[in-house]
């Protein structure tokens, strides 16, 4: 009888991918990046092992928001002090802090446990077209669709 293949942490080969976010829809990009971080695009995917690759996203400030999300989608945060609720629209976040906009979107698509936190550390988001990971020789990743 055959047993199910389970990847071991030591035998996982990781690649570095660079993705250009110019004009790409936020949700479509986020779901694909979450899948790469998780390793679901590999045949040796194992749910409880980090089999994913590293992802560099450039031009985060040029991400696309469809419909009226730029004005209607609101992100909330709270300082834990009375009256400390802060809110920002997606358009304001895209202008002021585009890296945070993408990170929040991708983090919400990863597991909510210690593995998810480990996967999130392999994501690097940059607002401009320059990144500091040239030494890793990242491959350009073409998005599906």
Swiss-Prot record:
Lineage of the native species?
Bacteria, Bacillati, Bacillota, Bacilli, Bacillales
Question: Could you tell me the keywords of this UniProt record?
Answer: Ribonucleoprotein, Ribosomal protein
Disulphide bonds in the chain: none
* GO terms of biological process kind: negative regulation of translation; translation
Known role? This protein is one of the early assembly proteins of the 50S ribosomal subunit, although it is not seen to bind rRNA by itself. It is important during the early stages of 50S assembly.
Molecular-function GO terms, alphabetical = mRNA binding; structural constituent of ribosome
Keyword Acyltransferase carried by entry: no
The name under which this protein is listed is Large ribosomal subunit protein uL13
In the record, the note on similarity to other proteins reads: Belongs to the universal ribosomal protein uL13 family.
What's the name of its gene?
rplM
């Amino acid at each position: 009888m055959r047993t199910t293949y389970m990847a071991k942490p030591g035998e996982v080969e990781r690649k570095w991918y660079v993705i250009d976010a110019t004009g790409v829809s936020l949700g479509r990009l986020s779901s694909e990046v979450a899948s790469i971080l998780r390793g679901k695009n590999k045949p040796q995917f194992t749910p409880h092992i980090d089999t994913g690759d590293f992802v560099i996203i450039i031009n985060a400030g040029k991400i696309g928001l469809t419909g009226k999300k730029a004005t209607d989608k609101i992100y909330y945060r709270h300082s834990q002090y009375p009256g400390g609720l802060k809110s920002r629209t997606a358009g304001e976040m895209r202008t002021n802090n585009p890296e945070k906009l993408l990170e929040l979107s991708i983090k919400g698509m990863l597991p909510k446990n210690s593995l998810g936190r480990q996967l999130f550390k392999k994501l690097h988001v940059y607002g401009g077209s320059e990144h500091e990971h040239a030494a890793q020789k990242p491959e350009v990743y073409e998005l599906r669709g």
